[in-house]
Amino acid sequence: MAITKEDVLEYISNLSVLELSELVKEFEEKFGVSAAPVMVAGGAGAGAAAAAEEKTEFDLVLTDTGAEKIKVIKAVRAITGLGLKEAKDAVEKTPSVLKEGMNKEDAEKAKADLEAAGAKVELK
């Protein structure tokens, strides 16, 4: 019996977030592609305006916990003020937005603190 697209979709829909993330990484490595969204080129005026305007607000996104999960949870609690359960949930469900609308200085400091704890972080 051949595997159908529906079988594949059913299997994927039953994966956990972590398993799905690992699957995407394996696809990226095997096929040499990126899961990043495709950027559509804007007009010349829009590109020049975007380059002149520096971003002032950042979202802190935890992309990977790393090996030191407990240290990362402690860092998340210190940065966000979340309780232990909420911080643990945020760390286990990567990628997750930890804090939105941060200024550049605070965002860079938070990123450095999380990276020191062993996490991988992006500022968006």
Curated annotation (Swiss-Prot):
InterPro entries given in the database record: Ribosomal_bL12, Ribosomal_bL12_C, Ribosomal_bL12_C/ClpS-like, Ribosomal_bL12_oligo, Ribosomal_bL12_oligo_N_sf
Keyword rRNA processing: no
Gene3D superfamilies: 3.30.1390.10, Single helix bin
GO molecular function: mRNA binding; structural constituent of ribosome
Listed GO biological process terms: translation
GO cellular component, one term: cytosolic large ribosomal subunit
Domain of life: Bacteria
Basic and acidic residues compositional bias, start-end: 101-114
Record carries keyword Ribosomal protein: yes
UniProt-annotated stretches for the region Disordered: 99-124
Key words of the record: Ribonucleoprotein, Ribosomal protein
Low complexity compositional bias, start-end: 115-124
Subunit structure comment from the entry: Homodimer. Part of the ribosomal stalk of the 50S ribosomal subunit. Forms a multimeric L10(L12)X complex, where L10 forms an elongated spine to which 2 to 4 L12 dimers bind in a sequential fashion. Binds GTP-bound translation factors.
Listed HAMAP family: Ribosomal_bL12 (MF_00368)
Family designation: Belongs to the bacterial ribosomal protein bL12 family.
Stated role: Forms part of the ribosomal stalk which helps the ribosome interact with GTP-bound translation factors. Is thus essential for accurate translation.
Protein name: Large ribosomal subunit protein bL12
Organism of this sequence: Campylobacter hominis (strain ATCC BAA-381 / DSM 21671 / CCUG 45161 / LMG 19568 / NCTC 13146 / CH001A)
